[in-house]
From Swiss-Prot:
This is Phosphoribosylformylglycinamidine cyclo-ligase. It catalyses: 2-formamido-N(1)-(5-O-phospho-beta-D-ribosyl)acetamidine + ATP = 5-amino-1-(5-phospho-beta-D-ribosyl)imidazole + ADP + phosphate + H(+). Belongs to the AIR synthase family. Keywords: ATP-binding, Cytoplasm, Ligase, Nucleotide-binding, Purine biosynthesis. GO terms for cellular component: cytosol. The keyword Ligase applies.
């Protein structure tokens, strides 16, 4: 059995260490108090800056150790999609329309072919998200970086009265899941350390090689969510990234009673190799890359809109009692 912490990513330890940076960052809010761009207190996935009738939403994220798989097989044309997806999917959680991004690419040494392939993914991701890449930084650091690191910072905009905070979520609301394309960009450290030493990247599983499963690009949910926001009163939005279903706690203090889809593909392979169910749901998206919370009255219309883009399904309901229960797998996070 291998857990995320044993693989080298101890989220509890990280959270404890991170509090020092968070505390320092919060103290800087006073530097913009009463000025244009004053930080708001209502963001969860993205920070919100006050710009009159609008909030400017801002977030930052990266591809993580997925780049190690790309490097191992010499295929870099999709990690740009991943980086953009990780950022824009966070922006839409507050109801913001993503508009622009700057990238950060840290490398040991320049390689034209790698740059060309990364650029293809960045362009494809930007097109899908409807954003402009307006700048960036390439850091060549042979003494510090042994490989590659790709990250970005994205901004979006939302009218103040249209921010999605989760405050409208009520017990009984419908919880809808939008399918993921696979592992996305979270849990790669655990997946790599568990599977690659045992099978190798060319191992075939369900007619696909392992590296293909691991490099499948993160799905971008901008188009379906923006259309949904125009048609239905959305109560809450959650990007299911690092932390798996625990991300739902970011949008409300109410609980969730869910029935998750069958464990298939890369998740089935990981589970078959000894990762317990609770750890699976704590680390991976488990086939659900994005969650939408709406009233029961709006459920059918929401499903109709979302299914025009990606397979979407009712997962369950919001409950009065806190905690997340995956009823069909007997998993509880209280």
């Amino acid at each position: 059995m291998l857990t995320y912490a044993q693989a080298g990513v101890d989220e509890e330890k990280t959270s404890k260490a991170l509090r020092f940076i968070i505390e320092a960052a919060r103290k800087t809010f006073e530097f913009r108090k009463g000025k244009l761009g004053e930080p708001g207190d209502i963001g969860h996935y993205s920070a919100l800056l006050d710009f009159g009738n609008y909030y400017l939403a801002i977030t930052t994220d990266g591809v993580g150790t997925k780049v190690l798989v790309a490097e191992a097989v010499g295929k870099f044309d999709t990690i740009g999609i991943d980086m953009i997806a990780m950022n824009v999917n966070d922006l839409i959680c507050v109801g913001a329309e993503p508009i622009a991004l700057v990238d950060y690419f840290a490398i040991k040494e320049p390689n034209e072919r790698v740059f060309e392939e990364v650029a293809k993914g960045l362009y494809k991701g930007a097109k899908e998200a409807g954003i402009a890449i307006v700048g960036g930084e390439t850091a060549v650091m042979p003494d510090l970086v042994n490989g590659y690191d790709l990250a970005g910072t994205a901004i979006g905009i939302v009218e103040k009265d249209k921010v999605i905070t989760g405050e409208k979520i009520r017990p009984g609301d419908a919880v809808i899941g939008i399918s993921s394309s696979g592992i996305h960009s979270n849990g790669l450290t655990l997946a790599r350390k568990l599977l690659i030493p045992k099978y190798g990247l060319d191992y075939e599983y369900e007619s696909r090689k392992l590296w293909e499963w691991l490099l499948e690009p993160t799905r971008i949910y901008v188009k379906p969510i923006l259309e949904l926001l125009k048609s239905v009163e959305v109560h809450g939005l959650a990007h299911i990234t690092g932390g798996g279903l625990l991300n739902l706690k970011r949008i409300t203090n109410y609980g969730f009673r869910l029935n998750m889809p069958p464990i298939n593909g890369i998740f089935k392979l990981i589970h078959e190799n000894g990762v317990p169910l609770e750890e699976m749901f704590r680390v991976f998206n488990m086939g659900v890359g994005f969650v939408v919370v709406v009233s029961q009255e709006d459920k059918e219309e929401a499903l109709q809109i979302l299914n025009r883009y990606y397979e979407s399904f009712e997962l369950g309901t919001v409950s009065e009692r806190p905690g997340i229960i995956v009823e069909n797998y007997g998993v509880k996070f209280i």
